[in-house]
Amino acid sequence: MNDRYELLAPIAEGGLGTVFRARDRQLGREVAVKRIRADKAQNVGSAVEALIRDARQQSAIQHPNIVAVLEAGVDEEGGYLVMELVQGETLEDRLGRAPLSGDEFDQLVRQVLAGMSAAHAAGIIHLDLKPENIMLTPRLGGGIHVKILDFGLARPVAPPDGEADIKRNSLHGSIHFMAPEQFERADVDERTDIYALGCLFYYALTHLHPFDGDTKPQVMVAHLYHRVNPLGKLRPDLPAHTVRWIEWLTSRHPAERPSSVAEALKVYENGVLS
């Protein structure tokens, strides 16, 4: 890898890897490179296998609102993943700096739903949708372009035999954006992502979590018992349809949520929720 990519500076660190800004010597462009950190991976071999598997999954999703995977491999230093370098800031950073305008929120919703619709159509669920995994890039002339990052916890909607049991018996994700069925070790599907999106959009409007607590167990209980901070009280200026739509996405039981991202987008656009 080092023959082609020159690591320039770290961009971010995760549980198992570090993401670097890098230069592609062959094409003369900047890219992002994720490296597995051997000092943080309990089983480096398994971590590398997971990285390559996740790269294959993400590369199957070709969409302008999902970060593109360019290359993945293994060298003498371990596993690596090369992605397009997205300029801009995360949704988390943006909300810490300034709230979204109404138009920006509308663009966020439409583009995130478009990207996740493509992912689900490819048979992939994300399972770690959160503000840190949403990049916003200013457009020339105004507006924002949205990119969804980090499919590191993603899995096929219909995983191979045995893999579903492994996923069910493990608990991964960001607790404020996890659906009740994840805490219950129950089956997950597209509607699990839809719940996370509802939490994400609520957060984008308030900079607060719909299900919260002083400790992680308290947050989990809030999800499980649906103890939600009413959006309408925090943002009485919002259209009633927007409030009801987000409440629909964050319904306690999967069967009560939209059956697909496409359905969620259609209802959002039509402004009618029966």
PLM regions with names:
Residues A114-I124:
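Protein kinase catalytic-loop region centered on the HRD/HxD motif
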Residues T18:
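Conserved N-lobe ATP-binding subsite of Hanks-type protein kinase domains
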Residues A72:
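Activation-segment/catalytic-loop signature of the eukaryotic protein kinase fold
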Residues R37-A60:
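AlphaC helix of the eukaryotic protein kinase fold
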Residues E76-T90, R94:
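Conserved short submotifs of the Hanks-type protein kinase catalytic core
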Residues Q42-G45, P138-F183:
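Activation segment of protein kinases
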Residues L108-V109:
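Activation segment signature within eukaryotic-like protein kinase domains
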